[in-house]
Amino acid sequence: MWLRPLCLLGVALTSCGCFGGPASRAYVLSVASDSAPAQATAANFPSLQVTTAALPSFLDNSDILVRHGPHALDSSPTGHWGERLSLGITHALAADLSQKLPGYRVSSARSETPSGRRLQLEVDSFDVYPDGHCVLAASWAIVQKSGDAPVTLGQGVFTTPAAGVNHAADEELVSAMADTISQLADAIGSTMADDH
């Protein structure tokens, strides 16, 4: 007789634990677009394929990681990436470059076109801090698809200042990270514009 109320209590407590916390929201680094990208579609425009970004293995997952001190990382309990971070960086960078390089056909999809260029990105670090401060250190090579000799090499450290709060919300952290990718696209785009 007392077993049934005890079971019901257990189910009720389990339900509260499962559904009582904040819902986890999925984020992406690229911005949703209301219109088609303003990029070249003419066949005579050069192509630029953005290959999947290489980054440290501990970053390449779906956790939004926040740096605490020199050695500690915490996963956000309320947010996660909608795709692996390497793919998110690649998609956001390709989208930013397509806006910044209207004379190129920019794509993150693998292209069978033998002509054109390929952008290879290596992310050394991509740290976001509780206050929203973000630092991206990366190097890149732009190579002709027909060969491996780099046309352009570059590297840089890109930062977004703190959001002005002690503990930034997930939206602010993601926005700071997207801003640093936009800065990276500016740097890559300026070398491509000079070379075109």
What function would you assign to each model-found segment?
Residues 1-18:
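Sec-dependent bacterial lipoprotein signal peptides
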Residues 17-83, 115, 194-196:
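A structural "domain/chain start" motif
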Residues 72-80, 147-184, 190:
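Short secondary-structure boundary motifs at beta->alpha junctions and helix caps
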Residues 47-52, 65, 118-123, 135-141, ...:
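Soluble periplasmic/extracytoplasmic beta-strand elements of cell-envelope proteins
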Residues 55, 142, 172-175:
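Juxtamembrane/interfacial segments around transmembrane helices
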Residues 19-37, 100-149, 163, 167:
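Surface-exposed short loop/turn segments
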Residues 86, 90, 94, 98, ...:
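Extracytoplasmic/secreted envelope proteins and their assembly/folding machinery
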